[in-house]
């Protein structure tokens, strides 16, 4: 399960030099010949990766995907990410797993609120808090997308 961030970086002739982006893709310290950097219009970053974090996946299905679990990509607003941070923080602090219960499914791994469950929640809080702070501090952010993959 992935949370990615897409940032628009298209260079336009009408932009002031200080507003233009430059993205260069190197391999082995040299620019790749098969990628024209002037045509790059978007940068996609992997913000989070969860492996078998079924409670978090269920949260996205219920709160972002309108209950539809179809492995498609869904846009996630920053306010929703903050809701997830707040919820995960509360569960880690109180150990009340009824707030974000583990889910069943053949592809989901453990349905116990074990050490891995709490590690996933703590990692989610740490990484998403850092990402949202970065967005706020730079006053620029991209668009976030969640996608499950089995």
What spans do the regions from the language model cover?
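Acidic (Asp/Glu-rich) sequence patches and key acidic residues
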Residues: 1-150
């Amino acid at each position: 399960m992935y949370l990615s961030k897409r940032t628009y970086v298209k260079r336009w002739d009408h932009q002031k030099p200080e507003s233009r982006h430059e993205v260069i893709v190197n391999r082995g310290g040299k620019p790749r010949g098969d990628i024209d950097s002037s045509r790059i219009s978007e940068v996609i970053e992997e913000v989070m990766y969860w492996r078998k974090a079924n409670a978090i996946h269920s949260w996205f299905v219920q709160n972002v995907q309108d209950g539809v679990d179809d492995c498609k990509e869904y846009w996630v607003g920053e306010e929703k990410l903050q809701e997830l941070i707040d919820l995960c923080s509360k569960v880690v602090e109180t150990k009340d797993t009824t707030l974000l219960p583990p889910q069943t499914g053949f592809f989901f791994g453990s349905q116990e609120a074990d050490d891995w469950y709490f590690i996933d929640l703590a990692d989610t809080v740490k990484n998403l808090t850092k990402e949202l702070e970065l967005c706020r501090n730079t006053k620029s952010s991209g668009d976030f997308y969640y996608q499950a993959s089995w």
